[in-house]
């Protein structure tokens, strides 16, 4: 019997059903899903922040209706057509399925990170953002109005900037990683400075992960080629050996309530498994190949611990525009979804009902929480056919085995205007939006050319990168890069 052909990860037939796609007119730099409501917030390269509310039930129904209609008309799967079978909207929109709750010019320059308050007593009530302007702001999620803010320039060294935010799940600690490898800690109540951990990494901090089961003061960070375990009061607890590959993101798995097992994504297209109880996180224990042609830029736990398969899984987004579900117990990719052929996956989140949210600089997709009935039917059919063929071929002893497949919110009044942060009446930064946006676009255009050569040397190339569609806007010149380096100069 012939050996099954091994499929390339990039040629796997994508699975899953998107129910919503939001297309952005300016590069998306950060996105976050609300932990308890159907809301997501987007931070853009221009410094704007948008808050949208969606009706997931209507989106699911509309997607299913389109699929059923296509199947009724042509007796074929909707996935065989070139048309989208999900809802597509612009970033500012008001429909029955999705509305823009508020929008504002929150920062001068890019908005680099957005984050909802995860503390149980105030979960989702507050939104934290940080921009290129070195200002951290805390706002009311419902209205968008700023409650407090702080300029952290005094805490940064020359030519340093914040890349990533992280919040303790139990204490008012807001952590920020910087381009120079430091971690700054603020009191999230009033944004006063509390701690500073210097030289955690030699280069930018790519990701920060809280360790609530260990201590509210303990966190993991990745940056450059190392993983560090830090105590925000005392400094570095341990730092891993040099992995000789850039570490970009990480996640605990849902079935580990001790924060012991952590999965780490690499620039070389792999995911590695680490255990604190084995070797104090000094080195990886094993690795899982995901996509050798791309970098694994972002990772998040599947979170749904009610399902054994999902409880052992993480989602990984890569620079080829693919999203892979990796089961660490099986040591392999068990599902692959296509976010976009011309948009790298730089952001992942899980909404309040365990729906996957994927995003790149151009668009965001929200995926159905329901299983893919078509794929299950097709899979059963293929298995049946293969079984019959196998029986027939076994009699002849010469057959070859066929290749296997390894809530709706009300439309609130718009709060955008010509002034920065017009949504909040207390903010005194009054610059015209048109002037600020024009400056942002010039900065983006100028920096993109400067960074292009640098990125070419460090990033694995997508097979379709040279044929990416050209957009008729200034921001189309912005080059993509893996990890936190997409922020270079912005």
Swiss-Prot record:
<comment type="similarity">
    <text>Belongs to the WD repeat WDR55 family.</text>
</comment>
<feature type="compositionally biased region" description="Basic residues">
    <location>
        <begin position="469"/>
        <end position="484"/>
    </location>
</feature>
<dbReference type="GO" id="GO:0005730">
    <property type="term" value="C:nucleolus"/>
</dbReference>
<feature type="repeat" description="WD 3">
    <location>
        <begin position="118"/>
        <end position="155"/>
    </location>
</feature>
<keyword id="KW-0853">WD repeat</keyword>
<feature type="compositionally biased region" description="Acidic residues">
    <location>
        <begin position="413"/>
        <end position="437"/>
    </location>
</feature>
<feature type="region of interest" description="Disordered">
    <location>
        <begin position="368"/>
        <end position="490"/>
    </location>
</feature>
<feature type="repeat" description="WD 1">
    <location>
        <begin position="23"/>
        <end position="64"/>
    </location>
</feature>
<protein>
    <recommendedName>
        <fullName>WD repeat-containing protein JIP5</fullName>
    </recommendedName>
</protein>
<feature type="repeat" description="WD 7">
    <location>
        <begin position="340"/>
        <end position="377"/>
    </location>
</feature>
<feature type="repeat" description="WD 4">
    <location>
        <begin position="157"/>
        <end position="196"/>
    </location>
</feature>
<dbReference type="GO" id="GO:0042273">
    <property type="term" value="P:ribosomal large subunit biogenesis"/>
</dbReference>
<dbReference type="GO" id="GO:0006364">
    <property type="term" value="P:rRNA processing"/>
</dbReference>
<feature type="compositionally biased region" description="Polar residues">
    <location>
        <begin position="450"/>
        <end position="461"/>
    </location>
</feature>
<dbReference type="InterPro" id="IPR015943">
    <property type="entry name" value="WD40/YVTN_repeat-like_dom_sf"/>
</dbReference>
<keyword id="KW-0677">Repeat</keyword>
<dbReference type="InterPro" id="IPR036322">
    <property type="entry name" value="WD40_repeat_dom_sf"/>
</dbReference>
<feature type="repeat" description="WD 5">
    <location>
        <begin position="242"/>
        <end position="284"/>
    </location>
</feature>
<feature type="repeat" description="WD 6">
    <location>
        <begin position="286"/>
        <end position="327"/>
    </location>
</feature>
<feature type="compositionally biased region" description="Acidic residues">
    <location>
        <begin position="370"/>
        <end position="406"/>
    </location>
</feature>
<feature type="repeat" description="WD 2">
    <location>
        <begin position="70"/>
        <end position="112"/>
    </location>
</feature>
<keyword id="KW-0539">Nucleus</keyword>
<dbReference type="GO" id="GO:0045943">
    <property type="term" value="P:positive regulation of transcription by RNA polymerase I"/>
</dbReference>
<dbReference type="InterPro" id="IPR001680">
    <property type="entry name" value="WD40_rpt"/>
</dbReference>
<feature type="compositionally biased region" description="Basic and acidic residues">
    <location>
        <begin position="438"/>
        <end position="448"/>
    </location>
</feature>
């Amino acid at each position: 019997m012939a050996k099954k052909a091994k499929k390339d990860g990039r040629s796997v037939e994508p699975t899953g059903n998107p129910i919503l796609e939001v297309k952005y007119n300016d590069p998306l730099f950060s996105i976050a899903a609300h932990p308890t409501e159907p809301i997501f917030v987007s931070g853009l390269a221009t410094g704007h922040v948008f808050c949208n509310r969606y009706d997931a039930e209507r989106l699911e129904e509309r997607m299913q209706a389109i699929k059923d209609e296509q199947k009724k008309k042509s007796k074929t799967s909707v996935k065989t057509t070139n048309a989208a079978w999900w809802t597509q909207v612009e970033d500012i929109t008001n429909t029955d399925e999705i509305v823009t709750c508020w929008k504002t010019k929150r920062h001068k320059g890019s908005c680099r990170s957005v984050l909802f308050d995860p503390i149980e007593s105030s979960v989702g009530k507050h939104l934290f953002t940080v921009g290129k302007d070195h200002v951290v702001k805390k706002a009311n999620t419902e209205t968008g109005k700023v409650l407090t803010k702080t300029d952290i320039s005094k805490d940064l060294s020359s030519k340093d900037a914040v890349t990533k935010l992280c919040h303790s799940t139990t204490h008012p600690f807001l952590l920020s990683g910087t381009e120079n490898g430091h971690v700054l800690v603020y009191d999230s109540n009033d944004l006063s400075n509390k701690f500073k951990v210097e030289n955690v990494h030699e280069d930018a901090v790519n990701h920060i992960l809280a360790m609530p089961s260990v201590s509210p003061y303990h966190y993991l960070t990745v940056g450059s080629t190392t993983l560090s375990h830090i105590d925000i009061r005392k400094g570095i607890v341990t730092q891993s050996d040099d992995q000789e590959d850039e570490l970009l993101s990480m996640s605990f798995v849902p079935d580990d309530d001790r924060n012991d097992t952590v999965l780490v994504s690499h620039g070389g297209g792999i995911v590695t498994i680490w255990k604190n109880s084995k070797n104090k996180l000094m080195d990886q224990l094993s690795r899982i190949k995901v996509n050798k042609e791309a970098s694994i830029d972002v990772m998040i736990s599947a979170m749904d611990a009610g399902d054994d398969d999902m409880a052992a899984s993480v989602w990984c987004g890569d620079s080829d525009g693919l999203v892979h579900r990796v089961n660490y117990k099986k040591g392999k990719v068990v599902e692959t979804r296509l976010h976009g052929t011309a948009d790298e996956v730089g952001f992942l989140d899980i909404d309040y009902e365990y729906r996957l949210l994927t995003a790149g600089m151009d668009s965001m997709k929200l995926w159905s929480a329901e299983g893919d009935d078509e794929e299950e039917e097709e899979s059963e059919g293929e298995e049946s056919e293969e079984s019959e063929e196998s029986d027939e071929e076994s009699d002849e002893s010469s057959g070859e085995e066929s290749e296997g497949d390894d809530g709706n919110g009300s439309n609130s009044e718009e709060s955008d205007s010509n002034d920065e942060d017009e949504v909040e009446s207390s903010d005194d930064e009054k610059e015209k939006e048109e002037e600020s946006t024009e400056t942002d676009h010039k900065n983006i255009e100028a920096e993109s050319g400067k960074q292009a050569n640098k990125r070419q040397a460090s990033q694995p190339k997508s097979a379709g990168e040279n044929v990416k569609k050209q957009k008729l806007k200034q921001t189309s010149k912005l080059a993509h890069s893996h990890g936190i380096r997409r922020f270079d100069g912005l």
